[in-house]
A protein has these predicted regions:
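Helix-to-loop junction immediately C-terminal to a conserved catalytic motif
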Residues: 53
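Conserved ABC transporter NBD signature motif
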Residues: 61-77
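Q-loop/switch helix immediately C-terminal to the Walker
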Residues: 87, 92-108
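Conserved ABC ATPase "signature" region
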Residues: 111-127
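Conserved ABC ATPase signature
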Residues: 130-138
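Hydrophobic anchor residue at the start of the ABC signature
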Residues: 144, 183
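Catalytic Walker B motif of ABC-type/P-loop ATPase nucleotide-binding domains
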Residues: 155-159, 164
Length: 204
């Protein structure tokens, strides 16, 4: 019996300015699974994630998202894929609460779930602060908070533990494992040794 893969990549190759970044790469992502992508700086981890997220065209190969060659919309009321870049997508002129409510309303997140995520990441005291006041670590936690209540089945995370201290890295791991237990799936590029459920590691 064939498995239903959330993302299926076959024989991917990617070149930039005549340089081969990666080639002949295949992977299958299924429910409850995390694929961890490792490699030195410049090895192509971010490029691979951007290709798998549909932001950057591959040079050759084939990608299926939910058994379809058409990429699902990211910014919709029912997203299938959530993206977390190594750069935090935060509007500094808005408060922390306004940044979060923009997505919570779009995704019709239940207030109880929204408040639970805020509490888990200890963000209650920051809610009325302008987002521009946050430190690098706090901005990272804000981005993780947004991901944590996103209803998307697949999370694509680029260096999610950047700027996090040990306590918040443990919270990150907990959030990711809960997503996997709830039949979600994760593609993650990281330098850290994350203790994850049902993980597969790819080194570029």
């Amino acid at each position: 019996m064939n498995k239903d893969f959330l993302i299926k990549a076959q024989d991917l190759s990617f070149e930039r300015s005549g340089r081969i970044i990666f080639s002949s790469l295949s992977l299958n992502l299924e429910e409850g699974q995390i694929i961890i992508i490792k490699g030195k700086n410049g090895s192509g981890k971010t490029s691979l994630l951007r290709c798998l997220a549909g932001f950057t065209p591959i040079t050759s190969g084939k990608i299926l998202w939910f058994d379809n060659e058409i990429l699902p919309a990211f910014y919709s009321d029912k997203p299938l894929i959530a993206w977390l870049s190594h750069l935090d997508a935060i509007k500094g002129s808005l408060t922390v609460k306004e940044n979060l409510l923009f997505f919570a309303k779009m995704w019709s997140v239940e207030p109880s779930i929204f408040n639970e995520c805020i509490k888990k990441l200890s963000f209650e005291k920051f809610m009325n602060f302008p987002a521009s006041w946050l430190s690098a670590g706090e901005k990272r936690r804000l981005s993780l908070l947004r991901i944590s209540f996103c209803p998307a089945k697949v999370w694509i995370l680029d260096e999610p533990s950047t700027f996090l201290d040990n306590d918040n890295r443990e919270i990150l791991i907990d959030i990711m494992n809960i997503h996997l237990k709830n039949k979600g799936a994760i593609l993650c590029a990281t330098h850290d040794n994350l203790k994850m459920l049902n993980s597969i590691e790819i080194t570029l």
